[in-house]
């Protein structure tokens, strides 16, 4: 079984498009030597790490108009 599950991710995100955008930008940061925010990550890939951060509330996004 995959972690985090797609059901958990879609419940937490406003839309799947926002989820993909946030995860891809964070994965790019991780690839460029940013520090992982999850204590014991299950994934070794950057996108998986970004999704783990998102589901554990370590990765928070904010819209330019101030929405969260």
Swiss-Prot record:
Disulfide bonds: none
Single Gene Ontology MF annotation: DNA-directed RNA polymerase activity
Gene3D superfamilies per UniProt: 3.90.940.10
Entry EC no(s): 2.7.7.6
One GO-annotated biological process of the protein: DNA-templated transcription
Catalyzed chemical reaction(s): RNA(n) + a ribonucleoside 5'-triphosphate = RNA(n+1) + diphosphate
InterPro entries reported for this sequence: DNA-dir_RNA_pol_omega, Pol_omega/Rpo6/RPB6, RPB6/omega-like_sf
SMART domains assigned: RNA_pol_Rpb6
Highest taxon above the source species: Bacteria
Family stated for the protein in its record: Belongs to the RNA polymerase subunit omega family.
Self-association and partners: The RNAP catalytic core consists of 2 alpha, 1 beta, 1 beta' and 1 omega subunit. When a sigma factor is associated with the core the holoenzyme is formed, which can initiate transcription.
Described purpose of this protein according to its UniProt entry: Promotes RNA polymerase assembly. Latches the N- and C-terminal regions of the beta' subunit thereby facilitating its interaction with the beta and alpha subunits.
Name this protein carries in UniProt: DNA-directed RNA polymerase subunit omega
Organism, as annotated: Brevibacillus brevis (strain 47 / JCM 6285 / NBRC 100599)
Gene of this entry: rpoZ
């Amino acid at each position: 079984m995959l972690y985090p599950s797609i059901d958990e991710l879609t419940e937490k995100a406003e839309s799947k498009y926002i989820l993909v955008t946030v995860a891809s930008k964070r994965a790019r940061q991780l690839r460029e030597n940013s520090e992982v925010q999850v204590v014991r990550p299950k994934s070794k890939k950057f996108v998986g790490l970004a999704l783990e951060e998102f589901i554990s509330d370590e990765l928070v996004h904010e819209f330019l108009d101030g929405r969260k």
